[in-house]
Regions:
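Mature catalytic core of soluble alpha/beta enzymes
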Residues: 1-155
């Protein structure tokens, strides 16, 4: 919608979904650059608040995880992403981040893939043109779809 209204350069964050339209102006006023978006580290006790940053233009960055919306009962933490097979919180990952052109689709994909076994999720993401994913496993290691690293900002 915003593009149809003439917006050519915009970064929008709504409820944790981030959408980049076009590129941003560089500080010296000469040229443009891709937007830099940090991907939050789901491990709250870590000193490192972001896992990595991605460089995007014309894409959305959407994450689903077990670290923001949860509650604790008798010492057990329950998050909001429910496994449709067990009807309990999904136990596969700490976080899934999706890069794609449509923020609504990214939101649906991040939740759906959060509930899939890793290899099934990877195959599904790899079958979708223009879509990449990052998984944060329970032990904190990361796994990416085939083209995700093309967007990662070098440290």
């Amino acid at each position: 919608y915003l593009e149809s209204r003439g917006f050519q350069s915009l970064l929008l964050s709504v409820g944790g979904n981030i959408r980049a339209i076009g590129k941003k102006a560089v500080p010296d006023g000469e040229g443009e650059a891709r937007w830099t978006i940090g991907i939050q580290n789901p491990e709250k006790s870590s000193e490192r608040t972001e896992l990595m940053a991605v460089l995007i233009d014309g894409l959305s960055v959407v994450s689903s995880g077990n670290y923001e919306r949860y509650y604790t009962v008798n010492g057990t933490r329950y998050h909001h992403i429910i496994d449709p097979e067990t009807l309990f919180p999904s136990a596969c990952f700490n976080q899934v981040t999706i890069l794609c052109g449509d923020s609504g689709l990214g939101d649906a994909l991040s939740t759906a893939v959060f509930n899939m076994p890793l290899e099934e999720g990877r195959a599904y993401i790899d079958s979708l043109a223009g879509t990449e994913a990052l998984w944060v496993l329970k032990d904190g290691t990361t796994v990416c779809s085939a083209g995700f690293w093309d967007y990662v900002k070098p440290e």
